[in-house]
Amino acid sequence: MASLAGDRWREALKNHDIFNNLQERLHLEPQGTSKRIAKNLTFCLNGDLFIWDSVESVFYTTNLRQLNSDGEPDTSRYQTLLCINPPLFEVCQVLVSPSQYHVALIGQRGATVLELPQRWGKKSEFEGGRIQINCKTIPVAERFFTSSASVTLRQAVWYPSETEEPHLVLLTSDNTIRFYNLKEPQSPARVLSVSQMDDDSSVHTRSRSYAASLGETAVAFDFGPLADSPHLSSLRMKAELVVYPLYILYGNGETFLNYISLSHSVGSLGKPMGPLPMYPAAEDNYGYDACAVLCLPCVPNILVIATESGMLYHCVVLEAEEEEDGGAVERWSRGSETAPSLYVFECVELELTLKLPAGEEEEITESDFTCPIRLHRDPLCQHRYHCTHEAGVHSVGLTWFKKLHKFLESDEEDKDSLQELAAEQRCIVEHILCTRPLANSLPAPVRGFWIVSDLSLGATMICITSTYECLLLPLLSSIRPASPPLLCSHPGAGSDSSPLRGLAEDSFEQHIRNILARSSTNPLMLRSGDKDSSPPPSECLQLLSRATQVFREEYILKLGLAHEEMQRRVKLLSGQKNKQLEDLALCREDRKSLTEAAERLADKYEDAKYRQEAIMNRVKRVLGSLRSQLPVLSDSEKDMRKELQTINDQLRHLDNGIKQVNMKKDYQKKQMNAGASPAHSSLTLNAHQRKCLQGVLKEQGEHIAGMMKQIKDIKNHFSF
């Protein structure tokens, strides 16, 4: 029941009125080349799903947590965010700022920033739950795009700092990256020229077209994680400044690097460093149709370079050594700066259109279909990212990153072992959605893509199709890192788990997973056009043949291999079990014999101990007799004699004291007897005097008794 309650919002979102309204106005959208481009018009923020309506130029938003609440979900309730100054261009992408207060509306002919309204009320809705809300919009570089008709916007991202003022970074077709502050959206706060020409002041449209044909124009860029400014000594920056590395990708596959700090009070930035050397070297420089770059925020940084032909290059960013900072970066070096190098750890080819099986007499022909690819980070896993393009959606998981991290920490310098590591474990590529199964199929690119990172809703991929159909797909759980175990679940010394499991680097389960890993899958296929019309029989036959081949090669055959491996494992474990049972029987016999031997040894030990004590007593007596016959006193005997002399002196002194006491006693007795008779008649004592005299006599008697007792004890102690 808990799983059904967690899936309630998924069923409600598919049938939401937002998508019904968008599907009804689908025919009103402009028809043109933009329909062939994969867009991203949706995002999630604090459990709210936002979808951009290109016809009305508004945002529709609904709360996913409320759809997941108990009771019947209200699929007709949503809020509409109106733009006070709607964009005049067609929006292809929406980007939420790092501070989550602004949303950038990106198109090929401009950019506009929408400021999100405030939240209040019981359900924390925008402006207390109003149905329609006017939102402030800020056009960015509007005058620049209006005056420059031939310049198009290639890419736009937010500056990644959350503590500084929000800045929107734009890459335009004139090989320039501009940083715009929202307080002054018409004039750039920073300008970075990324042209490979020495003098860019006289560049015209024809020159830019020549540079584009040669692949010398910047096509994409991405910010890396926060850099440590003290290591950038050549930049002459203060240690407290926030510095981000900026990776710039050109169409010919070259990558350049620049360090950006908006706290630096310089209006224009210097030339980027590059091209960054790539190892191992390739004749085609790893592609000539690069289109996207993504820096994964892990250590070491992984740079993903995508080409329009569907190739993905996973490059490890390695710090440069002193002998490597010449040659390749000589033209672009600035002072004593050193540029890092890119080690191409892995090359992956995406299956853009489905590869159809060839007949017996047919030759396998390579598909020449190409399209731009857009890369998306995964908020739940740093080692995973996603690709959206005209032909569908792919997910890529870097399962080898942990082994690479261990290899880099081991300080090994053997490049062959690094290549063996790359060939040992490949990344996992999952074909999630196919919107163009064949190269001659009509385009149907996705209109929205997002990963729900709210764990209360569950890790889910949201895909909005070209017909505004909401697809909710599960993520590949084998890539996402497992949650840490509870403290109470840690196995102790008495755990039933085998100690041999810790000796193996990879478990048998991981071995089976590697066998079952699929190089190609049967994705969820969507086709454009009328849903009621059936595809041609030839296309159906090709797709059926392809699905059959994938099921045969990637499922049935690999399941057979896994079955054989498991049978081999069972046979091996059965043999080990029989051998261990035999060893256990031998151990029981050995334990029984050892117990009997221990009992015999215990008896012998007791006998030997008794004999040893008897011998020790005899030795003591013999030594005592020998010591007594020696003419010279030992040290202990001398001490004993001295102690006896001291005791004798003390006894003599006490004897004298006793004699004196006795003499005093006799004298006092005589005195009492002599004066008792004459004084009896004449001397009379009163009661008080009699009492005092009795007390004195009693004290003297007690004193004498104590002395007598002390003398008696001394005599008893020394046996006198």
From Swiss-Prot:
Q: Kindly state a single biological-process term from the GO annotations of this entry.
A: mRNA export from nucleus
- Output the Gene Ontology terms for molecular function: structural constituent of nuclear pore
Q: In which compartments does the protein localize?
A: Nucleus, Nuclear pore complex
The UniProt-reported impact of D414Y is: Does not rescue developmental defects in sa2206 mutants
**Residues forming coiled coils:** 584-611
Tissue-level expression reads: Widely expressed. Higher levels of expression are detected in highly proliferative frontal regions of the embryo, e.g. brain, eye and anterior trunk.
Which keywords describe this protein according to UniProt? Answer: Coiled coil, mRNA transport, Nuclear pore complex, Nucleus, Protein transport, Translocation, Transport
In terms of one coarse class, where is the protein primarily found? nucleus
Task: Write down the InterPro entries for this protein, in alphabetical order.
Answer: Nucleoporin_Nup88, NUP88/NUP82
- Please explain the role this protein plays, according to its UniProt record: Component of the nuclear pore complex.
Full protein name? Nucleoporin 88
